[in-house]
């Protein structure tokens, strides 16, 4: 750690993000859209140019939609990708092909991570108040009551004191978020544990251009002789993964002849493939003891590591950014108290732990090398697939843990109710307004808080005081109606947007819930829900629980009044090869 310096009352930046990987870049885009001064520091000189993650889920795409970049990301994806689990004879044991898109996007998508990460980086060009500093490792930091003094390695850039001339640079930030991977320097500085296990099993991972198979889907081979995976990414790239046996060394596995033998099971000409990259790796199942300590926080691999079998490492990190980003923006802009940041650990830890456990369990199911154990597993899986409900359970990925916050930045009017929608993500159907037709709901709601009422005017339901408080916070208001009532003007209000239920999805949602008034957080989690008559009381409870301040804004920040930077019209762009 660096020695304590004089306490300053000003800050070089509001938030310092350590690490320019997908989590750090997503977080910086969220903060950028909210007008928060942000500096991203990265020890590398450029983005990592090889794939690591290979699957995006619907929640990640919804987050990219929220930062105005989904149209740039989509060209690098394979939507609705099917995953098949095969036995030793390459017969299908189980299949995952979830059909619904309740959050607006397909649940399974292959993608090319370097190209998607490059789009996230290019998105930061929209914000003069967001900077990226390459070749700038964080070497230490010290927190005081008002901020964090951070020391960067030589050539640490030109923000703050020093840097750019071979000497260490110092920056002062209100908060520091470590998105710096499994070997996180931020986590070490915080002094928190990283408990869990590292598997003794090793895998050879090979990325190949000009896909020798060419089909759009993926398979996992639960072959006791040698478990494997074959994954279609996008743009003609395929990943193969092969288990390395205990009596095989890393050197053997990295020999081209070894790869040729492995690929011979999959393609007719294994010696005629274009290898992009190969490496040997192991799986980790670990989680940090704390995601927050004072003004330092962790996200992504710095906070948790999980095996690859559910493709949730990348997506879990994007969930972290979506959960933390709006909370940091609210606190830094003076619209919420610092205690709101405590809810980040409360909400994300349980779900991250569930994803780690699921990924670890799936790895154990597919990778036994004992033939009797594998045979018993195959029999059990096939027997289960005969039962329609069990088959749908796997096919539709119903086993995937969904975020459901029982405590945190939520208010449960009836904590014991298992069917309460509070703490879950709201659906995202396609809707109509009087100005737009057939648009995704989030594009209507905007990037901040939203108050939704079915068949009612939010102002009348909330009352003038509560309505004014939400309006001062920057929230928007929506009256949800059947499409037949979209153009009826009898209850028009200049502060309320009328939304037409284009396909009946909204009514179907309200059909299954008693609540008719919803308070949505910026990450589209339902913070509170109630019947219309209880709305004023729930509104007051939410302001208290989330420590919200209607007319917030820190005069020292210079960003307190900025809650939304208008986005350009969505447009697809070509691949971005490196940092802008």
From Swiss-Prot:
One of its GO terms (biological process) is 3-phenylpropionate catabolic process. Its cofactor is FAD. Its EC number is 1.14.13.127. Pathway: Aromatic compound metabolism; 3-phenylpropanoate degradation. FAD binds at residues 14-43, 291-301. Keywords: Aromatic hydrocarbons catabolism, FAD, Flavoprotein, NAD, Oxidoreductase. NCBIfam families: PRK06183.1-2, PRK06183.1-3, PRK06183.1-5. PANTHER family: 3-(3-HYDROXY-PHENYL)PROPIONATE/3-HYDROXYCINNAMIC ACID HYDROXYLASE (PTHR43476), FAD-BINDING MONOOXYGENASE (PTHR43476:SF3). Belongs to the PheA/TfdB FAD monooxygenase family. This is 3-(3-hydroxy-phenyl)propionate/3-hydroxycinnamic acid hydroxylase. It comes from Mycolicibacterium paratuberculosis (strain ATCC BAA-968 / K-10) (Mycobacterium paratuberculosis). The gene is mhpA.
């Amino acid at each position: 750690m660096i020695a304590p310096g004089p306490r300053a009352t000003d800050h070089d930046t509001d938030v310092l993000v350590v690490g320019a990987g997908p989590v750090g870049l997503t977080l910086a885009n969220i903060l950028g859209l909210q007008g928060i001064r942000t500096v991203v520091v990265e020890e590398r000189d450029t983005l990592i140019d090889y794939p690591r993650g290979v699957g995006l889920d619907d929640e990640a795409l919804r987050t990219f939609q929220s930062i105005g970049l989904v149209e740039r990301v989509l060209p690098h994806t394979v939507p609705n990708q099917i995953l098949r689990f095969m036995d030793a004879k390459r017969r299908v044991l189980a299949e995952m092909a979830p059909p619904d898109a309740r959050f607006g996007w397909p649940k399974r998508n292959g993608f090319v991570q370097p190209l998607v990460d490059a789009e996230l980086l290019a998105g930061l060009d929209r914000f003069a108040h967001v900077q990226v500093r390459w070749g700038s490792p964080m070497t230490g930091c010290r927190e005081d009551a008002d901020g964090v003094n951070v020391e960067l390695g030589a050539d640490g850039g030109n923000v703050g004191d020093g840097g750019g001339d071979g000497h260490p640079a110092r920056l002062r930030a209100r908060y520091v978020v470590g998105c710096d991977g499994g070997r996180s320097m931020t986590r070490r500085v915080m002094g928190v544990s990283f408990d869990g296990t590292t598997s003794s099993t090793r895998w050879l991972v090979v990325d190949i251009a000009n896909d020798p198979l060419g089909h759009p889907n993926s398979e996992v081979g639960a072959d006791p002789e040698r478990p494997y995976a074959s994954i279609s990414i996008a743009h003609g790239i395929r990943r193969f993964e092969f288990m390395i046996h205990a009596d095989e060394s890393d050197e053997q596995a990295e020999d081209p002849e070894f790869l040729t033998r492995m690929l011979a099971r999959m393609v007719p000409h294994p010696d005629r493939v274009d290898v992009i990259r190969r490496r040997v790796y192991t799986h980790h199942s670990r989680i940090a003891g704390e995601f927050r300590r004072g003004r330092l926080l962790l996200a992504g691999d710095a906070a948790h590591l999980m095996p690859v079998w559910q493709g949730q490492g990348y997506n879990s990190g994007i969930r972290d950014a979506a959960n933390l980003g709006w909370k940091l923006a609210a606190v830094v802009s003076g619209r919420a108290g610092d205690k709101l940041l405590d809810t980040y650990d409360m909400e994300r830890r349980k779900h991250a732990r569930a994803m780690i456990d699921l990924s670890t369990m799936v790895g154990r199911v597919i990778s036994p090398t004992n033939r009797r154990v594998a045979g018993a597993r195959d029999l059990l899986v096939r027997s289960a697939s005969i039962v329609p409900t069990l088959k749908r359970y796997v096919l539709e990925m119903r086993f995937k843990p969904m975020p459901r916050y029982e405590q945190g930045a939520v208010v449960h009017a009836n904590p014991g109710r298992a069917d309460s929608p509070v703490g879950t993500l709201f659906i995202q159907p396609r809707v109509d307004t009087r100005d737009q037709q057939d648009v995704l709901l989030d594009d209507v709601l905007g990037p901040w808080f939203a108050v939704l009422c079915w068949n009612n005017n939010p102002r009348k339901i909330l009352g003038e005081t509560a309505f004014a408080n939400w309006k001062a916070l920057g929230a928007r208001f929506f009256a949800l109606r059947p499409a037949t009532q979209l153009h009826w003007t009898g209850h028009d209000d200049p502060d309320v947007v009328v939304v037409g239920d284009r396909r009946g999805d909204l009514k179907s949602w309200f059909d299954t819930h008693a609540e008719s008034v919803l308070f949505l957080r910026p990450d589209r989690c339902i913070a509170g829900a109630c019947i219309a008559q209880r709305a004023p009381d729930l509104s007051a409870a939410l302001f208290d629980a989330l420590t919200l301040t209607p007319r917030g804004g820190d005069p020292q920040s210079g960003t307190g009044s900025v809650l939304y930077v208008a986005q350009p019209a969505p447009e697809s762009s070509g691949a971005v090869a490196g940092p802008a």
